């Protein structure tokens, strides 16, 4: 009789920063013969994204409380209790050998339900500062892993699992060899587009159009509006989305973008210099993510409050290709190519203990 397949329940949802690293770990374990099931919510991005990667998904009902009215806050205990019961039912039916929490609202009830069922919980924090759910779950998790060394004082640093295609790009030395002409600037606003970048970059290009070639990802529905802001004869390509981020990063001499955890880890994986404009948040999550590469000499940080076309022109004109190549090499040195493998190894270790 063949040995029974090991089963992993993955809890991750809400944003690509949680979901994509979790998919990377899930796919690695699938290649090792594991069975994977996903716990998510039906109204967030994981509902469409996860099945496309051939991973079955189950849903519970839970949402965040930030910015909600008094009625939602008063009903929160009932909503959380209901979500725990829903997660417990799924866990009882699936009987996983381990549960991986990668963040998002779904991880809270799922983690509690797993603990109640006696299933080992392995937690991974993608950001440089832990979110509320993960801060609480860390108290009941069997193992806590982190991408950056600042989220938890005693957790193992493993990096962020990212797509392997990012690591297979040519090295910075290979990419920069023989490059001439205008500096290649990639502007990435994310799935929503970063309005502040969409408004600022056209003015930068107006001042430096003879020195820059720009690819600008503006987000859904913004192409027409942003196109009208750019000078007519500038070397600019504008798109809603970029399907192949690995190739786009590799094309660029420098990337201007937000500093979500996944973006920072992807830039390190490829080895690309960056100008980060962190999203303003009270816990400084994106600023601390950006600092990881900035402290290594691989990036510059411009706080959003200080971002003007003049400031960006000043920063860009300080760079030449030799400087940007050295920054890219430093970024590559901060990459963690074995992150997905290491998270998977910890899951296997804990599953084998029970």
Swiss-Prot record:
Broad enzyme group: transferase
Cystine pairings recorded for this chain: none
GO cellular component: plasma membrane
Annotated residues for binding of UDP-N-acetyl-alpha-D-glucosamine: 15-17, 127, 163, 191, 242, 261-266, 286
Catalytic activity annotation: di-trans,octa-cis-undecaprenyl diphospho-N-acetyl-alpha-D-muramoyl-L-alanyl-D-glutamyl-meso-2,6-diaminopimeloyl-D-alanyl-D-alanine + UDP-N-acetyl-alpha-D-glucosamine = di-trans,octa-cis-undecaprenyl diphospho-[N-acetyl-alpha-D-glucosaminyl-(1->4)]-N-acetyl-alpha-D-muramoyl-L-alanyl-D-glutamyl-meso-2,6-diaminopimeloyl-D-alanyl-D-alanine + UDP + H(+)
Keyword line: Cell cycle, Cell division, Cell inner membrane, Cell membrane, Cell shape, Cell wall biogenesis/degradation, Glycosyltransferase, Membrane, Peptidoglycan synthesis, Transferase
Gene Ontology MF: a single term: UDP-N-acetyl-D-glucosamine:N-acetylmuramoyl-L-alanyl-D-glutamyl-meso-2,6-diaminopimelyl-D-alanyl-D-alanine-diphosphoundecaprenol 4-beta-N-acetylglucosaminlytransferase activity
Domain of life: Bacteria
GO biological process terms on file: carbohydrate metabolic process; cell division; cell wall organization; lipid glycosylation; peptidoglycan biosynthetic process; regulation of cell shape
Alphabetized Pfam families for the sequence: Glyco_tran_28_C, Glyco_transf_28
Entry-linked SUPFAM superfamilies: UDP-Glycosyltransferase/glycogen phosphorylase
Gene3D superfamilies tied to this protein: Glycogen Phosphorylase B
InterPro entries assigned: GlcNAc_MurG (IPR006009), Glyco_trans_28_C (IPR007235), GlycoTrans_28_N (IPR004276)
Its EC number(s): 2.4.1.227
Compartment(s) where it occurs, according to its Swiss-Prot or TrEMBL record: Cell inner membrane
Membrane topology summary: Peripheral membrane protein
Pathway: Cell wall biogenesis; peptidoglycan biosynthesis
HAMAP family tied to this protein: MurG
Entries under NCBIfam families matching the protein: murG (TIGR01133)
Similarity comment: Belongs to the glycosyltransferase 28 family. MurG subfamily.
Known function: Cell wall formation. Catalyzes the transfer of a GlcNAc subunit on undecaprenyl-pyrophosphoryl-MurNAc-pentapeptide (lipid intermediate I) to form undecaprenyl-pyrophosphoryl-MurNAc-(pentapeptide)GlcNAc (lipid intermediate II).
Protein name: UDP-N-acetylglucosamine--N-acetylmuramyl-(pentapeptide) pyrophosphoryl-undecaprenol N-acetylglucosamine transferase
Native source species: Pasteurella multocida (strain Pm70)
């Amino acid at each position: 009789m063949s040995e029974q397949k090991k089963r992993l329940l993955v809890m991750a949802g809400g944003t690509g920063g949680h979901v994509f690293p979790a998919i990377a770990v899930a796919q690695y374990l699938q290649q090792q013969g594991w069975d994977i099931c996903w716990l998510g919510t039906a109204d967030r991005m994981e509902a469409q994204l996860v099945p496309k990667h051939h991973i079955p998904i189950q849903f519970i009902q839970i949402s965040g409380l930030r910015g909600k009215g008094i009625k939602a806050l008063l009903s929160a205990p009932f909503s959380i209790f209901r979500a725990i019961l829903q997660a417990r039912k799924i866990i009882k039916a699936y009987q996983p050998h381990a549960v991986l929490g990668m963040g998002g609202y779904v991880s809270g009830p799922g983690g509690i339900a797993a603990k109640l069922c006696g299933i080992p919980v392995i937690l991974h924090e993608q950001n440089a500062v832990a979110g509320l759910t993960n801060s609480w779950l860390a108290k009941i998790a069997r193992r806590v892993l982190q991408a950056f060394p600042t989220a938890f004082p005693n957790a193992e640093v493993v990096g962020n699992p990212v797509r392997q295609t990012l690591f297979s790009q040519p090295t910075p030395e290979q990419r920069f060899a023989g490059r001439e002409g205008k500096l290649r600037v990639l502007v990435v606003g994310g799935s929503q587009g970063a309005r502040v970048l969409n408004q600022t970059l056209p003015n930068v290009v107006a001042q430096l159009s003879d020195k820059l070639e720009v690819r600008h990802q503006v987000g859904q529905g913004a192409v027409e509006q942003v196109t009208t802001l750019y000078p007519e004869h500038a070397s600019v390509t504008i798109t809603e989305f970029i399907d192949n981020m690995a190739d786009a990063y590799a094309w660029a001499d420098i990337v201007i973008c937000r500093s979500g955890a996944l973006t920072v880890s992807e830039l390190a994986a490829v080895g690309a210099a960056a100008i980060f404009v962190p999203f303003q948040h009270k816990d400084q999550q994106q600023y601390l993510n950006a600092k990881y590469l900035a402290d290594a000499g691989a990036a510059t940080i411009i706080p959003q409050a200080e971002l003007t076309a003049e400031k960006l022109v000043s920063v860009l004109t300080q760079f030449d290709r030799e400087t940007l190549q050295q920054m890219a090499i430093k970024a590559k040195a901060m990459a963690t190519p074995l992150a997905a493998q290491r998270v998977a190894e910890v899951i296997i270790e804990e599953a084998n203990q029970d």
